Amino acid sequence: MTASPPATLQDPDDAAAFARRHVRHNVLALGADFGLFLIGLSFSSQTTILPAFAAHLGASNLIIGAIPALMTLGWNLPSLFAAGYTESLAHKLPFVLRYTIWERVPFLVLAAVAFFVAGPIPGLALALMLTMLLLMTGAGGLLMPAWMDIVARAVPLGLRGRFFAVSNLLGSGGGLLGSVLTAWVLARMPAPRGFGVCFLLSALCMGLSYVALMRCASRGPRWWRRRRRSEPICAA
């Protein structure tokens, strides 16, 4: 008898079987990523906290009012230009893991700005704040098609509606608690230090969200190490 040849590294049936074996793990990992991301955003709300911080820095009413619109545009517009490139990627997860850092690090920068720059140089702090918001939302918009593709591959169609419903519910519930904690922090800490604590809480949740995304079961190369020639390819 001759042994049957091994499946090719990019065999779609083999990739689908891998996804089915890890569906529970990936649903939990991606759900935690999404939920924690939403909770992190609640500590730096684009409709309350960020405009209030901009007002503290002396921003004009035009800039304060434009912050939510600019962030919404940043989340959505880049996706139109990134979709074609994302579609050409053989593996989406390493791409997302590599560049989603630029969605998360800006919160640490905002915290540093609030603690060390906002007091002595508010004009510079405002410029840095707007730059970080553009970087964060631009990176998020560019990565959105790839992240949605990962969800589509990892979460079966029959579970997808429940996945987003439960993740949104938990994220919104956590966000409500986050809003309460934010109000408590701002009531007890003078500006801009209170804003800095809020940004640190956002960064903490974003970091935990990143760890959850890293736990997504993958057979492909991770961005932080070189792939061995014999290492199988990621389904996502």
Model regions: which residues?
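Hydrophobic core of transmembrane alpha-helices in multi-pass small-molecule transporters
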Residues: 35, 100, 106-113, 121-143
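Transmembrane alpha-helix boundary/hinge residues in polytopic small-molecule transporters
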Residues: 49, 80-81, 142-150, 181
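C-terminal membrane-cytosol helix-exit motif in multi-pass small-molecule transporters
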Residues: 203-222
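Helix-loop boundary and gating motifs at the non-cytosolic
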Residues: 2-86, 93-111, 165, 171
